[in-house]
Amino acid sequence: GLSDGEWQLVLNVWGKVEADLAGHGQEVLIRLFKGHPETLEKFDKFKHLKSEKGSEDLKKHGNTVETALEGILKKKALELFKNDIAAKTKELGFLG
């Protein structure tokens, strides 16, 4: 797994991704399909795309993927925040 510091780096970058989930998700899928064409076999509706950039379905699916990832990252961000607050309150003597 990632260290807390590595998670923080991911979360710091996520703000840029979050601004355009659908666009970034579409780009991730395009790169996946170009770099690993065999993965297209898992996606019947994308097998015969003529133009990935112009595909509204691909953009929608990219948004779905990025939204799911966003949920995971926000959960981790909350966990890191909670741990940080707990450590600070203990450091200040508020916890036994």
From Swiss-Prot:
Its EC number is 1.7.-.-, 1.11.1.-. It is an enzyme of class 1 (oxidoreductase). The modification Phosphoserine is found at S3. Nitrite binds at H61. Keywords: Cytoplasm, Heme, Iron, Metal-binding, Muscle protein, Oxidoreductase, Oxygen transport, Phosphoprotein, Transport. The modification Phosphothreonine is found at T64. Disulfide bonds: none annotated. One of its GO terms (cellular component) is extracellular exosome. It is found in: Cytoplasm, Sarcoplasm. It catalyses: Fe(III)-heme b-[protein] + nitric oxide + H2O = Fe(II)-heme b-[protein] + nitrite + 2 H(+); H2O2 + AH2 = A + 2 H2O. GO terms for biological process: removal of superoxide radicals. Residues 1-96 form the Globin domain. It comes from the Eukaryota. O2 binds at H61. GO terms for molecular function: heme binding; metal ion binding; nitrite reductase activity; oxygen binding; oxygen carrier activity; peroxidase activity. Belongs to the globin family. Monomeric. Monomeric heme protein which primary function is to store oxygen and facilitate its diffusion within muscle tissues. Reversibly binds oxygen through a pentacoordinated heme iron and enables its timely and efficient release as needed during periods of heightened demand. Depending on the oxidative conditions of tissues and cells, and in addition to its ability to bind oxygen, it also has a nitrite reductase activity whereby it regulates the production of bioactive nitric oxide. This is Myoglobin.
